[in-house]
Amino acid sequence: RTKRDVCELPFEEGPCFAAIRVYAYNAETGNCEQLTYGGCEGNGNRFATLEDCDNACARY
C-alpha cells in the first residue's frame, strides 16, 4: 500500500478495549483527528502523533 492508500482508509477502532489515543486522517475533511483505538486489528490509518499523521497524509 502507498501512503495515499492508507490515508484514504476509514479509521477502524478495532475490537479490543485498550482506549489508546491515536490520530487518523479523515479524507472527507482533509484533516488528521484524534480518535480512540482499541489496541488490536484496525488498519494503517493510525498514527501515534498528530505530526506523524500530518507528515503522512495532510497534503497528499
From Swiss-Prot:
Keywords: Disulfide bond, Protease inhibitor, Secreted, Serine protease inhibitor, Toxin. SUPFAM superfamilies: BPTI-like (SSF57362). Belongs to the venom Kunitz-type family. It comes from Californiconus californicus. PANTHER family: BPTI_KUNITZ INHIBITOR DOMAIN-CONTAINING PROTEIN, KUNITZ-TYPE PROTEASE INHIBITOR-RELATED. Residues 1-2 form a propeptide. The record marks F17, A18 as: Reactive bond for chymotrypsin. GO terms for molecular function: serine-type endopeptidase inhibitor activity; toxin activity. InterPro entries: Kunitz_BPTI (IPR002223), Kunitz_BPTI_sf (IPR036880), TFPI/VKTCI-like (IPR050098). Expressed by the venom duct. The cysteine framework is IX (C-C-C-C-C-C). Disulfide bonds join C7-C57, C16-C40, C32-C53. GO terms for cellular component: extracellular space. Pfam families: Kunitz_BPTI. This is Kunitz-type serine protease inhibitor conotoxin Cal9.1c. CDD domains: Kunitz-type (cd00109). It is found in: Secreted. Residues 7-57 form the BPTI/Kunitz inhibitor domain. The keyword Secreted applies. Its main location: secreted.
